Curated annotation (Swiss-Prot):
<dbReference type="InterPro" id="IPR014729">
    <property type="entry name" value="Rossmann-like_a/b/a_fold"/>
</dbReference>
<feature type="binding site">
    <location>
        <position position="188"/>
    </location>
    <ligand>
        <name>L-citrulline</name>
    </ligand>
</feature>
<dbReference type="GO" id="GO:0005524">
    <property type="term" value="F:ATP binding"/>
</dbReference>
<feature type="binding site">
    <location>
        <position position="39"/>
    </location>
    <ligand>
        <name>ATP</name>
    </ligand>
</feature>
<dbReference type="GO" id="GO:0000050">
    <property type="term" value="P:urea cycle"/>
</dbReference>
<keyword id="KW-0028">Amino-acid biosynthesis</keyword>
<dbReference type="GO" id="GO:0005737">
    <property type="term" value="C:cytoplasm"/>
</dbReference>
<feature type="binding site">
    <location>
        <position position="126"/>
    </location>
    <ligand>
        <name>L-aspartate</name>
    </ligand>
</feature>
<feature type="binding site">
    <location>
        <position position="120"/>
    </location>
    <ligand>
        <name>ATP</name>
    </ligand>
</feature>
<dbReference type="GO" id="GO:0000053">
    <property type="term" value="P:argininosuccinate metabolic process"/>
</dbReference>
<keyword id="KW-0963">Cytoplasm</keyword>
<dbReference type="InterPro" id="IPR018223">
    <property type="entry name" value="Arginosuc_synth_CS"/>
</dbReference>
<dbReference type="InterPro" id="IPR048268">
    <property type="entry name" value="Arginosuc_syn_C"/>
</dbReference>
<feature type="binding site">
    <location>
        <position position="126"/>
    </location>
    <ligand>
        <name>L-citrulline</name>
    </ligand>
</feature>
<feature type="binding site">
    <location>
        <position position="122"/>
    </location>
    <ligand>
        <name>L-aspartate</name>
    </ligand>
</feature>
<feature type="binding site">
    <location>
        <position position="276"/>
    </location>
    <ligand>
        <name>L-citrulline</name>
    </ligand>
</feature>
<dbReference type="GO" id="GO:0006526">
    <property type="term" value="P:L-arginine biosynthetic process"/>
</dbReference>
């Protein structure tokens, strides 16, 4: 669709430098109505000033929606039922937020009669893929305006100059030479000084967590209860999904839990450094795996575990709404029906360790079979036949090699 044909755009708007400039640029270049949408995913910032800034910068209408409960309940928790983790370290805090933002953006586009959507993701990053795959899931014919792939504002200074020319009220500072993105699950840092892969991230960068060496000298124990793979209570107190994750963030942050420094493989093909704080998510994943250990069948667990890398890649690469992810989610959720129980964790100076787990309804741990003491239910002599049968292929191969070498 040509610029002149676009009549109304809904923009995913944060109020930061990039999206404020994009808002003005859309008004100048497309000459159409622009509706902004800002999602409250637990950034910790007051979003009402964003409304005023959007109107001052040219927005015709502003949406600000509180999506915290939906974010944790319908996106974070399903992902955590799978124990998803990307490249062994990243708990996908940014990746899982984009599908929800795009979903609500497309709902607003339909409500407002918009014929185009826009976002502030750069042409080098993962987010452009995540947003646009979701857009096309909801409306295959939607027009996507991606300014970073159109304009010539290809440097930070060019953006600042554009902002000054257009009287966009944006504070410019060099005190924090990196970019960040925050929601209830995590906060991410990238760019700027972090592009030096040898440089240790400065301590003043971190927001959610204490440095482990300055965390309390006394460990804290926390008990997390699960029902069908979802956390429902902490230390016996039931909470909503968003309340629970926020509470774990506070506890984990106090003990320096959940810092990760990762050089990851982006979906567009390049490597990029990301530094993350995920205190509550780190605790939640450890607790979930502990309850699974006592409630989940071995072969079910091993099959599910073999699929975790693929499932995590789907989320990282923007395929949350794909049929393969939805199919896999059905299988994962089936495996979680027995994941009911409580995990007990010990938090101490950056470490989160399971020290106990129990399940009153679904425990597969049977002391009569597992004990190292004398028992009446397991005949240890039976192990001989089991071993001989399982070693048959190894013995045959050994005999074959011996005959071959004669």
């Amino acid at each position: 669709m040509a610029k002149k044909e676009v009549k109304k755009i809904v923009l995913a708007y944060s109020g930061g430098l990039d999206t404020s400039i994009i808002l003005k640029w859309l008004k100048n270049e497309y000459g159409c109505e622009v509706v902004t949408f800002s999602a409250d995913l637990g950034q910790g910032d007051e979003l009402e000033p964003v409304r005023e800034k959007a109107f001052k910068t040219g927005a015709d209408k502003v949406y600000i929606d509180d999506l915290r409960e939906e974010f944790v309940r319908d996106f974070v928790f399903p992902m955590f039922r799978a124990n998803a983790i990307y490249e062994g370290s990243y708990l996908l805090g940014t990746s899982i937020a984009r599908p929800l933002i795009a979903k609500r953006q497309m709902e607003i586009a339909q409500i407002e009669g918009c014929d185009a959507v826009s976002h502030g993701a750069t042409g080098k990053g993962n987010d452009q893929v995540r947003f646009e795959l979701a857009y096309y899931h909801f409306n295959p014919g939607i027009t996507v305006v991606a300014p970073w792939r159109e304009w010539k504002l290809n440097s930070r200074q060019a953006l600042i100059n554009y902002a000054k020319r257009n009287d966009i009220p944006i504070p410019i500072t060099k005190k924090r030479p990196w970019s960040s993105d925050r929601n209830l699950l995590h906060i991410s840092f990238e760019g700027g000084i972090l592009e030096d892969t040898w440089l240790e991230p400065p301590e003043n960068m971190f927001v959610l967590t204490k440095p482990p060496e300055k965390a309390p000298n006394k460990p804290q124990y926390v008990e997390i209860e699960f029902e069908k793979g979802n956390a429902v209570a902490v230390d016996g107190v039931r909470m909503s999904p968003a309340e629970l994750l926020a509470h774990l963030n506070t506890i984990g942050g106090e003990h320096g839990i959940g810092r990760v420094d990762l050089l990851e493989n982006r979906s567009v093909g390049m490597k990029s450094r990301g530094v993350y704080e995920t205190p509550g998510g780190t605790i939640l994943r450890e607790a979930h795996m502990a309850v699974e250990q006592i409630t989940m069948d071995r072969e079910v667990m091993h099959l599910r575990d073999s699929l975790i890398p693929r499932y995590a890649e789907m989320i990282y690469n923007g395929y949350w709404f794909s049929p393969e992810r939805e199919m896999m989610q059905c299988m994962i959720d089936e495996s979680q029906k027995t994941v009911n129980g409580v995990a007990r964790l010990k938090l101490y100076k950056g470490h989160c360790r399971t020290v106990g787990r129990k399940s009153e309804s679904d425990s597969l741990f049977n002391l009569d079979f597992a004990t190292f003491e004398k028992d009446q239910v397991y005949n240890q002599a039976d192990a001989e036949g089991f071993i001989k049968l399982n070693s048959l292929r190894l013995r045959i191969r050994s005999l074959m090699l011996a005959n071959k070498n004669k």
